[in-house]
A protein has these predicted regions:
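An N-terminally biased module of ancient metal coordination in phosphate/nucleic-acid-related enzymes
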Residues: 1-74
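Extended substrate/RNA-proximal surfaces in nucleic-acid metabolism proteins
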Residues: 56-120
């Protein structure tokens, strides 16, 4: 039973959370929450699963996002609520961010290899 509380900043395994999207909604219900916002870091991939589970067990799921942005030599995270997880512009931006992160990781691995660090 819900006590009317909400949590508007939840992460799933689609970013750095512990629970899958469905498990997160189940945990929200177990804790008596009426609604949650799924706001994964730079990902909307968990929203459909969470929304479906929410409809099934009567927990409102707000589709959201925690968007990483670079500002003045630092990073700022912007929370967005009631987003369209199928918006082509948004999906293109998220894909571009993902590709940039993968390229950065490859360069780090190359540098470590150049330094003689054994990686498996």
């Amino acid at each position: 039973m819900s006590d009317g509380s909400v949590d508007l900043h939840c992460h799933t395994t689609a970013s750095d959370g512990t629970f899958t999207p469905g498990e997160l909604v189940e945990e929200a219900r177990r804790r008596g929450l009426a609604a949650i916002a799924v706001t994964d870091h730079d990902s909307v991939s968990g929203i459909d699963e969470a929304t479906a589970k929410g409809a099934e067990i009567d927990v409102e799921v707000v589709p959201g996002l925690e968007l990483s942005t670079d500002v003045d030599n630092g990073e700022v995270h912007i929370l967005g609520y009631f987003i369209d997880p199928e918006d082509r512009g948004l999906l293109g931006l998220l894909e571009s961010q993902r590709e940039s992160r993968l390229e950065r990781a490859r360069k780090m691995l190359d540098r470590l290899s150049d330094l003689g660090v054994q990686l498996s």
